[in-house]
Design a protein with these regions (language model features):
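Non-catalytic C-terminal interaction segments of nucleic acid-processing enzymes
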Residues: 125-278
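Sterically constrained small-residue positions within well-ordered secondary structures
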Residues: 36-38, 53, 109
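A short acidic (Asp/Glu
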Residues: 2-7, 73-74, 129-131
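Short linear interaction motifs
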Residues: 24-29, 36-44, 92-104
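Short acidic loop-to-beta-strand element that houses the catalytic metal-binding Asp/Glu
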Residues: 39-52, 59
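Catalytic cores of nucleic-acid endonucleases
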Residues: 55-60, 65-129
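Acidic-basic catalytic patches of nuclease active cores, encompassing PD-(D/E)XK
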Residues: 1-38, 81
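Alpha-helix termini
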Residues: 12-21, 49-55, 106
């Protein structure tokens, strides 16, 4: 059985290593849980997909975020999201991710939409915080809407600077056209140009979306390991607790400090917390 819960449980058993490894990628992850593993390419890791998906589907995608401060490191060429279409991750038959998943015996397209998690480590003044956090903590509006509104700001600024005017309907059309992340990631080949141009999106977290920020989220203390899941209803909480008990076992489950935090933009999240060092 595979899932993000099983992955977090494997982190718990080796939690002291978070304070020892210089680079997060060097953490001794349990490769038996993984269908792929890469360095510097999204996803850094993926959980194996279960054949029987009644309780756990598996298949979660994980990106590592390592920082020498209590700020989640920037997202290069990606925008953090709660779910990802696997067909947009695997873009060709020669994809190393596809090859690794097939070698692992995974039915890649049996689970077309994958939950996304971020394993964030921050270090500051000899202390460490580690959070395995669902992507909804960062995706408080849709990716398309984020790009759309950002492009609209650029358009408004240029119109104001140039003194030009366009109708509201034309502006809306232009903004909607430039709302797909894939449009920016393609290499553009211009005739007679000696270079090719590719726009790269870089995403940085605001203080309100920075789970490592001690002022915004004081509950996430120094030297703690945290599992952070969206929890908007009592039913969500019951479901999360049920899965956690099933995977962690009674003894480990009872060691957790369990509480909710209120996201500044996006509802409540349930946190399972342990001290990093015994």
């Amino acid at each position: 059985m595979y899932s993000i819960y099983h992955f977090f449980n494997s982190l718990v058993s080796k939690k002291a290593s978070f304070g020892q490894v210089k680079k997060l990628v060097k953490f001794p992850f349990d490769n038996d849980l993984l269908s792929c593993r890469n360095d510097g390419q999204f996803p850094d890791m993926a959980i194996r997909v279960n054949k029987k998906k009644e309780i756990f589907t598996g298949g979660e995608l994980i990106e590592l975020k390592d920082s020498d401060s209590y700020v989640v490191s920037s997202f290069n060429s990606t925008i953090p999201t709660r779910k990802k279409d696997i067909s947009k991750v695997i873009t060709s038959d020669s994809s190393i991710i596809k090859q690794q998943m097939e070698k692992a015996g995974n039915g890649i397209y049996s689970l077309p939409f994958r939950d996304v998690f971020y394993l964030a480590r921050g270090r500051k003044k000899g202390h460490t915080k580690v959070c395995l956090v669902n992507g909804s903590f960062f995706e408080t509006i849709s990716v398309d809407n984020l790009i759309n509104k950002s492009f609209s700001q650029v358009l408004d600024e240029r119109l104001k600077e140039s003194g030009a005017e366009i109708s509201g309907s034309v502006k809306d059309i232009l903004s909607s056209i430039f709302s797909e992340q894939e449009n920016f990631s393609k290499v553009r080949n211009v005739e007679k140009a000696s270079v090719k141009l590719r726009f790269r999106i870089m995403t940085e977290v605001k203080a309100e979306g920075n789970i490592l920020n001690s002022k915004k989220y004081p509950e996430i203390g120094d030297d703690t390991l945290n599992f952070v899941l969206p929890c908007d209803t009592e039913e969500d909480e019951k479901n999360i607790i049920s899965k956690a008990k099933l995977v962690f076992g009674e003894n480990t489950f009872n060691e957790f400090k369990i509480f909710k935090i209120k996201h500044h933009f996006n509802g409540y999240f349930l946190v399972f917390q342990l001290p990093l060092f015994d």
